[in-house]
Structures are given as structure tokens and as C-alpha cells.
Amino acid sequence: MAANVGSMFQYWKRFDLQQLQRELDATATVLANRQDESEQSRKRLIEQSREFKKNTPEDLRKQVAPLLKSFQGEIDALSKRSKEAEAAFLNVYKRLIDVPDPVPALDLGQQLQLKVQRLHDIETENQKLRETLEEYNKEFAEVKNQEVTIKALKEKIREYEQTLKNQAETIALEKEQKLQNDFAEKERKLQETQMSTTSKLEEAEHKVQSLQTALEKTRTELFDLKTKYDEETTAKADEIEMIMTDLERANQRAEVAQREAETLREQLSSANHSLQLASQIQKAPDVEQAIEVLTRSSLEVELAAKEREIAQLVEDVQRLQASLTKLRENSASQISQLEQQLSAKNSTLKQLEEKLKGQADYEEVKKELNILKSMEFAPSEGAGTQDAAKPLEVLLLEKNRSLQSENAALRISNSDLSGRCAELQVRVTEAVATATEQRELIARLEQDLSIIQSIQRPDAEGAAEHRLEKIPEPIKEATALFYGPTAPASGALPEGQVDSLLSIISSQRERFRARNQELEAENRLAQHTLQALQSELDSLRADNIKLFEKIKFLQSYPGRGSGSDDTELRYSSQYEERLDPFSSFSKRERQRKYLSMSPWDKATLSMGRLVLSNKMARTIGFFYTLFLHCLVFLVLYKLAWSESMERDCATFCAKKFADHLHKFHENDNGAAAGDLWQ
């Protein structure tokens, strides 16, 4: 199994999946560029072929047509084959680009197998050591009085413990070195990911800018066409309105002329009627005939003039109608042309809008990028004007470098503080042990001091000698300095010597108390430092989550997904937990339940949280509960014992009373007393 894992690890390491993914990514970009170039060259070739057909005579076109068709068929076959190859490459690229690299997992598995094998070796060695220790214990049980053997065994045990400790330290150092190497590799991968993200972001911004310029140009052209169309329509409308007014005037004049012609016709008919009457009246004088002839001639002249005027007006009306129809045709043709141009521009605008649908959030992204520039990448107001001229990639790189330097400084300070914290914890444990020893020593000294004070007040003769036997040897040695070499064995201590001994013990006690207070102050300082480090670690974790959120925002642009490591997965899970609607909903529900609780329930819950969140409070609560249980059990035991004693006492008294009655009043009223007792 280990050989298979090792061979797989070597194979995947030689295979270098990440390098293959980068090469495939580069090849995909080159293919995309070549597709664009092929499309442009194809368009140019089509235009050149059209120009060739236009500028080439018919017989030459007929001769070249088969060659062109075969050449075009070969080009179509080559383009089809290249498209199929590109499609197959893109299919392989899509499947391989998101495949995670199994080298770290295989490396970790191999290391775990090595660790398991090493653990088995250590276990076997430990078993051997245990067997050896059991043998030594048997030998030690057999030869208890051999001090040399005991010392040798102790030395061997110390050596074994030292070897185990050294092995544990070497394993810890190897693990720390491995973690440092993994962290450096992850930082390098993160930098590469950020560089690729910035390049893709730059390409996307360039495309968006080009599309934006094309859209603005199209909008300006469309606006110019609309303004021209509006101006021409207004001019044509004004011209048509003028022509219509002229036409109405001509129609009015024609109607007036027709009415005048009708009146003249009526007058002519009346004149003809009068002429007929005059012809009938032939006997009339010559003067009247002359007058009638004159009136008839004048009416005829006037009628001819009116008819000429009517004909001229009819010609004017026809001419105006012809010009109106011509103007309508011209305006209709111009309107159709403008409508065609407008439809073409609208189709172009729709195409551009469809192209911009993928970048519909350009303004929002631009606004967010400006906000990011202003908030995250501008350290001061003076540097804001200088950073405004820098591109986003430079700002991201500078921010990444500053964050890396801050992270390194914080890591160094964290390691220093953790070392100091470990030293302080060791010191605190030593101080606590020393304090406990000092407390025990103080208690013994106080007990000995009370014994010495009781010696000064003997109850009777010989009591001092009896109590001097209870004094420990160190106190006897300490008091021997005050007695002198010929101190009486049966007398009381002098008052000055006891006072000096009390002053020594009290000063030593004060020194121990001051030292204990110093150690407690150092312990509080160490606890405060630990809390500050914990808060700083929480803030760093929050900053890392925010940085991961920004990286995820930058990775939201179209592109291949980069391989994720353990750190990214951990911060990704924390980021998803922050964005999880179920967790936020559960928090809101817990808050709502907490607000709907009664005040005493809130007090009980707060007290429980306070007790469970603090180690000292948990310890106090545990011992307090234990004390209450013991007290209740003691009270119950006392009550049961008192009741049993009362019962036993009552039984004993009744028995004694019955014995007394049987013994002393046996003859008189023994039966009555028995009935009374029953």
C-alpha cells in the first residue's frame, strides 16, 4: 500500500497538474485570439474575393472559379477540422482546469503512513520499554535492599524519558517546519491567483471600455439622425402647410370665379332672353337696339375674361396639386429612408445592448471599485490624490504587500507573545506551586507558633515537658539558638526570645505574602496579555475573512477556478457561515426567544451562561453544589440519626420502666401497669 501511494505521488509530482493547467489556460487564450484573428482574416478574404469578382473579366472568373471552389472547400474542411479540434481541446480544458492537484493529498497520505509506521515503531519500542520496565520492577521487587540497582534503574528511566522527550521535540520541530513550508507555498499560490485575477480584471475593464465607447458613439449617431429627421420633418411639415394654405386660397379664388361665371352665365342667359324679346319686338327704335348690342358685347367680353381667369386658376390648382403630390412622394421616400436608417441604428443599438447585458453591472462594479480604492487603498487624504492616478492592479499589489508585511509582523509578534505567554504560564505554575508550598509552610509555622505560645502557659507541673515533646525538630533547632547550650529543659521560654521568634516568623510571612501578591499581579498581567492576544487573533481572523471576501469578489469575474487549499477552505467555510441565512435566522430566532422570556428566566439564563463561560465560576459552582448536596445529606443523616436515637431511647426507657414495674410492683398492680403500657 505504501509503495502504491509512493509511486502515485511520484507520478503525479512528475505529471505537474498545475503546470499543465497553466499551459492549457495559455493555450486557450491563444486559441481565442486566433479565432478572433481568423474571423477578421476571413472577412478580409471575403471582401478581397468580392473586389476580385468585380474587377476581373468574365472569362478569367470562369477559369479561376473551379480553383477557387476547390480552395474554398479545402479551407472549409480545414476550418471544420480546426473547430472540431478546438472543441475537443476546450472539452478537455473544461474537465482538467478545475481538477484539484492530488499531490498534497498523496504527500499528506504518505507522511501519515510514515507517521503511522513511526508510531508503530514507537509503540513497539514503548512495549519493549514497558517489558524492560516490568522486568526491572520484578528485579526491584526481588532485590529491594540493593540501592545501586535502584539508582541504575532510575538513571535508565531518566534516559528513556529524555529520549522520548527528544523524539517528541524533533517531531514537533519537523511538524512546525512543514507547516511553515505549507504556509509559504499557500502564500505563493495566493499571490499567483491575485496576479491572474488582476490581469483578467484589466482585460474585462478594457473590453467594457471599448463596448462603452462603441455604445456612446452609436448613441451620438442615433441622436444626430433623430435631430436631422425631426428638422426635416418639421421643414416638410411647414412647407406642406404653406402649400395647403396656397391651395386653399386658390380653391377659394376658383370658387369665387365659378360663382362669378355662374352669375355672368345667368346674365348672359337673361341677355339672350332679352335679345330674343328684342328680336320679337322688331318695331323698336334703333337706339334701343344699339344699347342692347353694346350691353351684349360688354357682357361677352366680361364673360371671356372670367373664363380665362377660371382656366388660369384651374391650371394653378393642377400645378399646385402636382407639386403637392411630388412633395408628398419625396417626403415619403425620405421618411422611408430615414426609417430604414433608424431601424438599422436601432438594430445596432439592440446588438450593443445585448453585448452589454453581460456587463450590465458595469456602473455598480465601477462604483464598488472606486469605493474600494477610496476606502481600502487610500491610507491618508494626502496620498488619495496620488493613488487616484494608479490602476487597481497596482493598488491591489501594494495592499497585498502591506497586508503580507503586516501579517508577517503580526505572526512574529504572535510567536514572540506565545513564547512569552508560555514562559509566563511556566512562571505562573511555578509561582502557584511556590505559593502552595509557602501556604503549607505558613500553616505549619502558625501551628508550631501556637504550640510555642501554649508552652508559655503550662496548666500544671510537668505539662511543659509533655508539650515540648510535641514540638517538631526544626522548631527545636530554631529555639535552641535562643535558649543557649545550657537551657533548662523544664522551664518556660523567655519572653524576649519568643518575641524575636515571632518577629522572624511574621517578617517571613510578610515577605511570602508580598511575593505571593507579586506573583498574583504577574498572573493577572499574563491573563490580560492572553486576553489581548486572543482579541488580536479574533481581529486577525475577521480581517482574513474580509480579505477572503474581497478575493472571492475579484474571483467572481469569468475565468477558471483556482485550486483551493486548506486555509482558503477554512476561511471559505467561515465566510459561508457568516452569509448563511439559516444561521442568521437561527440567531434572530434565539434573540426573539430571549426577548420573549420573563425577567427571572433571563436572569437564570444569564447566570447559567456566566457560570458556564468562566472556569473559576464553573469550579465555584461545582464545589458549591457539592457542598449543598453534602450538607443536605448530612442534615438528613442527622435527622435520621436523631429520630433513631429518640426511638431507641424511647424503647430503652419503656423497657427500663417495664423492668422496674415487674421488679418492684410485681405483686400489687403489675397487670394494671402492663395494660397501661399497652
Swiss-Prot record:
Q: Name one GO molecular function term.
A: DNA-binding transcription factor activity, RNA polymerase II-specific
- Coiled-coil annotated residue ranges, if any: 67-450, 502-556
* Cellular-component GO terms for this entry: Golgi membrane; nucleus
Which keywords label this protein? Coiled coil, Disulfide bond, Golgi apparatus, Membrane, Phosphoprotein, Transmembrane, Transmembrane helix, Transport
Identify the residue ranges that face the Lumenal compartment according to the record. 641-678
Q: Does the keyword Transmembrane apply?
A: yes
Asked if Chaperone is a keyword of the record, the answer is no
User: GO:BP terms for this protein?
Assistant: intra-Golgi vesicle-mediated transport
| Subcellular location per the Swiss-Prot or TrEMBL entry | Golgi apparatus membrane
Residues on the Cytoplasmic side? 1-619
Q: Its function? A: May be involved in intra-Golgi retrograde transport.
On subunit structure and binding partners, the annotation says:
Homodimer; disulfide-linked. Interacts with GOLGA5.
Record's protein name: Protein CASP
- Source organism phylogeny: Eukaryota, Metazoa, Chordata, Craniata, Vertebrata
**What gene is it encoded by?**
CUTL1
